[in-house]
Amino acid sequence: MFATSRPGLLHPLHAILLAFPIALFTGALASDIAYLNTAEMQWSNFAAWMITFALVVGGPVLLWSLMLLLRRRNRGPARLYVACFAVAWVLGLVNAFQHSRDAWASVGVAGLILSLASTGLVLAAGWIAFSATVDREMVR
């Protein structure tokens, strides 16, 4: 019996930090949907806070990802991961500006579309990053 493992795309600390933007952008999307269904202004505040914290934690993740891209020889998955995360971070920044407006005008169609796009891209980035590790065991 032997096991082989291809090195993963992420360092364990990088993976832990990546989990925050994934959860927070998803939570912000859920808060936007709750706001649109209830018109309770606190949901818009929750979304703005989650987007802001996702950007704060996502900044170092993005820098680490760019350094990862520069150091990799096989850049295929790393390039796609960095592209998805970078676009998600920029859309999240635009979304933070959108959510900083008056609560009645912050979510609407534009806020919801930005939340959907940033959530989808950060989920795709997480999927790419966490599926890059391959472990194989062979029993003889």
What is each residue range found by the language model?
Residues 37-40, 70-74, 100-104, 130, ...:
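Transmembrane helix-loop junctions in multipass membrane proteins, especially transporters and channels
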Residues 15-28, 87-90, 117-125:
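Alpha-helical transmembrane segments of multi-pass integral membrane proteins
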Residues 10-18, 35-57, 77-81:
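Transmembrane alpha-helix entry/boundary detector in multi-pass membrane proteins
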